[in-house]
A protein has these predicted regions:
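Generic structural signal for secondary-structure transition and capping sites
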Residues: 1, 41-45, 75, 99, ...
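Short beta-strand scaffold segments in enzyme catalytic cores
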Residues: 66-68
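A general structural signal for well-ordered alpha-helical segments in protein cores
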Residues: 32-33, 129-136, 159
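C-terminal helix-rich "cap/oligomerization" subdomain common to oxidoreductases
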Residues: 71, 135-174
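NAD(P)-dinucleotide binding in Rossmann-like oxidoreductases
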Residues: 51, 56-61, 71-133
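Active-site rim elements
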Residues: 22-23, 119-122, 143-145
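A generic structural signal for residues located within well-ordered alpha-helices
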Residues: 28-31, 130-131, 150, 154
């Protein structure tokens, strides 16, 4: 998976200043590491990571590489960078045994740039609406919602282990 942005200032996608600093590991890698474990249906058994230098003003690493493995043998190789000099926004490339997929916001294409229609995948293209629908349904059905805090904890443990590898002194949080 490639997760690439261009970031030199502490601003959001709309160009507005943030009161917090974005982070490759604790924000962007979290999405992919969690998705990988979810899709595999297994907890991550091995992980390793490296990061580049800490940006002097932002106080975060601008580049990172992560490898994870589950007991059945599937692996995740994740490359993250805030040094991608491209349009505002992000793109994601997913490579698997079922093909190559590129996502940019709500657009999805295959590895040859053929658009994939995702408009009929769910009742809405709005991710926030879908999260809200799932949460309300879980309350009505008296069940744990998909993507609950409990389901996220294994991912947080993996990220903690990765942080201890790439930033053992927690310099990026000083």
């Amino acid at each position: 998976v490639q997760t690439y942005f261009f970031r030199r200032k502490n601003i959001n996608a709309a160009g507005n200043a943030r009161s917090w600093t974005d982070h490759l590991l604790w924000h962007h890698a979290a999405h992919t590491v969690d998705l990988f474990a979810y899709q595999c249906g297994e907890d991550i058994s091995e992980c390793y990571g490296v990061q580049g230098p800490i940006h002097p003003q932002l106080g975060i690493a601008m580049d990172m590489g992560i490898v994870c493995k589950v007991p059945s043998g599937s692996i995740l190789t994740l490359s993250l960078s805030f040094n991608n000099d491209g349009p505002l926004g992000s793109f994601f490339r997913y490579i698997c045994d079922n093909g190559t997929y590129k996502a940019f916001y709500d657009d999805l294409s295959d590895g040859k740039d053929n658009k994939i229609d995702v408009s009929k995948v769910d009742v809405s293209m709005d991710g926030i609406e879908l999260e809200d629908r799932e949460f309300i349904a879980a309350i009505k059905e008296k069940r744990e919602p998909n993507a609950s805090l409990a389901e996220l904890l294994p991912c947080m443990h993996v990220l903690g282990k990765l942080e201890s590898i790439v930033d053992p002194q927690r310099k990026a949080h000083a």
